[in-house]
Curated annotation (Swiss-Prot):
Pfam families: Ribosomal_S13. The gene is rpsM. Part of the 30S ribosomal subunit. Forms a loose heterodimer with protein S19. Forms two bridges to the 50S subunit in the 70S ribosome. GO terms for cellular component: cytosol; small ribosomal subunit. PANTHER family: 30S RIBOSOMAL PROTEIN S13/40S RIBOSOMAL PROTEIN S18, SMALL RIBOSOMAL SUBUNIT PROTEIN US13M. GO terms for biological process: translation. SUPFAM superfamilies: S13-like H2TH domain (SSF46946). Residues 91-121 are annotated as: Disordered. It comes from the Bacteria. This is Small ribosomal subunit protein uS13. Located at the top of the head of the 30S subunit, it contacts several helices of the 16S rRNA. In the 70S ribosome it contacts the 23S rRNA (bridge B1a) and protein L5 of the 50S subunit (bridge B1b), connecting the 2 subunits; these bridges are implicated in subunit movement. Contacts the tRNAs in the A and P-sites. GO terms for molecular function: rRNA binding; structural constituent of ribosome; tRNA binding. Transmembrane segments: none annotated. Belongs to the universal ribosomal protein uS13 family.
Length: 121
């Protein structure tokens, strides 16, 4: 199994798809890496030569991927929360950040319903 950026990429998949298993590399960036390195995107990972795997490793190091990217995103959210802006407060309260309505929707973000007993008439 080829190991790139600390991730074992699946052997049976095409290289173009297998690279997307790395956090921070999508299909577009995968195609860019393959065109820069000159590796055929239709070949399977198990058929890659060691030199091809090494080329892909070096190319993937040019991008912020995996742990570094996760840390960067976490720090960006923490910064928003620390400065107390609206987006940071919404993140802290687990509410939608981008202006969506919350009266009837946003169940995913708010969690399951908390039933409130009705008042007797």
């Amino acid at each position: 199994m080829a190991r790139i950026a600390g991730i074992d990429i699946p052997r049976e998949k095409r290289v173009e798809i297998a690279l997307t298993y790395i956090y921070g590399i999508g299909l577009t960036r995968s195609k860019l890496i393959l065109s820069n390195t000159g590796v055929n995107p239709d070949i399977r990972v198990k058929d890659l030569s060691d030199s091809d795997v090494q080329k892909l490793r070096v190319a993937a190091e040019d991008f912020t991927v995996e742990g570094d990217l996760r840390r960067q995103e976490g720090m960006a959210l923490k910064r928003l929360q620390d400065i107390g802006c609206v987006r940071g407060r919404r993140h802290r309260m687990s509410l939608p950040v981008r202006g969506q309505r919350t009266r009837t929707n946003a169940r995913t973000r708010r969690g399951s319903r908390k039933t409130v007993a009705g008042r007797k008439k």
